[in-house]
C-alpha cells in the first residue's frame, strides 16, 4: 500500500519547528562527517555555489561557508534557519550564507543550472513519498549546472528501526514523533537514472546506530 498524505508531512513540519525552538543547536556546531566529505568532493569538482536542503540550524551550511563556498541553505523550519543566520553573522559569514524557508514538496525557488553542488543530509528520508522524492531529485537536476554534484544521505532498510514503530506505508515508519522513509537500494538506483552514480557508501551514525547510505551522483 502506497499511503502518504500532506497531513503527515505537515505534522512533521510542526514537530521539527517545535524541536528546533526548544533545543537550539540540537546537533551541535561540529559539521557532520558527510558534509566534511562532501566539501572535499565539491572542491575537487571546482564547485563554488552550494545548495543545502534540510539545513536545520546550519552546522553543515556554516562548515561549507567556512571552507570558502557560497551557500544557499533551505529548511522548512524557520526556527532552525534563524539560528543559522544568527550564527553566520557572529562568525562573520553572513555574506557567504543565504537562507530560505522552503518545503521540498514544492519546486525549488532557483533558476535552471544555477548551482554547482547540492547537499542533503537525511532530508530525502523524511516524511516524503517515493513520488515526492523522485520529483525533488528531478528538480535538483534542473537547478544543477552540467557536471554538478549531488550528495545525499538516507537511512536504509537495513536500519534497526526499519519495520518497527508506527507504519505509514511506502517504507515510512514513525518513532518518537519523527517519521523516516527507509530507502531500499532500488530506490537509490532509480533516483540515479539519467545521472552518473559515482558512489554508494555505507556508514553508521549516532546511537542504535542509524545505518545510512551516502550517495554521490553527477549531473551529465
Task: Go through the PLM ranges and name each one.
Residues 1-45, 50, 56-106, 149-220:
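Class I (Rossmann-like) S-adenosyl-L-methionine-dependent methyltransferase catalytic domain
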Residues 139-146:
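Conserved helix-to-beta-strand junction in the class I
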Residues 109-118:
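A short acidic, Gly/Pro-enriched loop at the edge of an enzyme's catalytic core
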Residues 128, 145, 192-193:
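Short conserved AdoMet
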Residues 127-139:
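A short, conserved alpha-helix within the catalytic core of class I
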Amino acid at each position: 500500500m502506497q499511503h502518504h498524505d500532506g497531513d503527515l508531512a505537515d505534522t512533521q513540519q510542526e514537530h521539527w519547528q517545535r524541536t528546533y525552538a526548544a533545543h537550539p543547536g540540537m546537533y551541535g556546531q561540529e559539521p557532520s562527517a558527510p558534509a566534511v566529505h562532501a566539501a572535499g568532493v565539491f572542491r575537487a569538482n571546482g564547485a563554488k555555489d552550494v545548495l543545502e536542503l534540510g539545513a536545520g540550524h546550519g552546522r553543515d551550511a556554516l562548515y561549507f561557508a567556512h571552507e570558502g563556498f557560497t551557500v544557499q541553505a533551505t529548511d522548512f523550519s524557520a526556527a532552525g534557519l534563524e539560528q543559522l543566520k544568527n550564527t553566520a553573522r557572529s562568525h562573520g559569514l553572513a555574506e557567504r550564507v543565504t537562507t530560505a524557508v522552503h518545503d521540498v514538496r514544492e519546486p525549488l525557488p532557483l533558476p535552471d543550472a544555477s548551482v554547482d553542488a547540492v547537499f542533503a543530509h537525511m532530508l530525502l528520508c523524511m516524511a516524503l513519498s517515493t513520488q515526492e522524492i523522485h520529483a525533488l531529485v528531478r528538480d535538483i537536476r534542473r537547478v544543477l549546472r552540467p557536471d554538478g554534484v549531488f550528495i545525499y544521505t538516507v537511512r536504509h532498510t537495513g536500519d534497526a528501526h526499519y519495520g518497527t514503530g508506527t507504519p505509514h506505508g511506502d517504507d515510512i515508519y514513525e518513532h518518537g514523533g519523527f517519521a523516516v522513509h527507509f530507502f531500499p537500494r532500488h530506490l537509490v538506483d532509480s533516483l540515479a537514472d539519467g545521472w552518473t552514480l559515482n558512489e554508494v557508501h555505507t556508514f553508521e551514525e549516532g546511537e542504535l546506530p542509524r545505518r545510512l547510505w551516502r550517495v554521490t551522483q553527477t549531473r551529465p
